[in-house]
Amino acid sequence: MRQSRSTTGLASVFALLVGCASGPRPAPPASGPVTLTADEVRTLVASADARCQLLVSRQERDAGHADAVRAHQAAPRDRSAGLTLASCAQLRADFETDEARVLAITEQGAEAARLASSGPADAEAAYLQAVNLGQYVQAKGLVAIGRLSELVSLLKTASAKPEIDQGGPLRVLGLLYVRAPAWPVGPGDLDAGLDLLKQAAAKYPEHALNHLFYAQALIEADDHAAARRELDQARALCTAERFGDWAARWKKEADELAAKLR
């Protein structure tokens, strides 16, 4: 049985969490023809699934991403290979600081998820396409603001299965509504964001980002007392045993927000 795919919930889309690379990393291999047997593809996908997890080293995650790239290049229409590459790509990109690498990795990840989709109602593929597209948009900046509507559409599709990534579709769409510019420039809607993030924190209380993102929305709504409570919960959940390398950066963000509320 394959392990569940881990995602970080599009944190980098809104620059809430700043990547801290330990040094230059090679860009993902360029797309090209790769000939592998079906068994070899399955072996690579299994290896990538095992390595692209929150609780492994960055070196292992990068190696898993490389495995996923090879599998997808050999079988670009294979659903498992495509979804695995999309998952590995957004995890790898979240710790990259070089814009060109982020763009290459996430563009490839989003396209892999799109090709893997079984149709317009495929929530898992939509979510993985969204988290990669979100990181791509963040790296591109204002020139990519026109793609926010595409992000909203993908996340609405993903929300049919809110349990993905422990409330991932709810918290990512909620944060997008909170952070994006409002109509007519963008899809921003604080009330809608608050509602989605409240649901995420209530239904999936074990994920730190649900509380951290809800606190962000509550601060925007000037409900500082409730925001402090959510930040306390987020910080308590931010342990390396739960979230690996991401725990320290999420806790730092929560600490900084809490300090501003004093």
Predicted regions and their residues:
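N-terminal leader/linker segments that initiate helical-solenoid repeat arrays
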Residues: 21-94
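Short coil/turn linking the two alpha-helices of tandem helical-hairpin repeats
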Residues: 48, 53-55, 91-100, 135-144, ...
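Helix-turn-helix repeat elements of alpha-solenoid scaffolds
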Residues: 55-69, 99-111, 144-152, 185-194
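Short coil turns that delineate tetratricopeptide repeat
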Residues: 76, 120-121, 163-164, 205
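TPR/TPR-like (Sel1-like) alpha-helical repeat modules
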Residues: 152, 225-240
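Terminal, low-structured helical/coil segments at or just beyond the last alpha-helical repeat
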Residues: 236-262
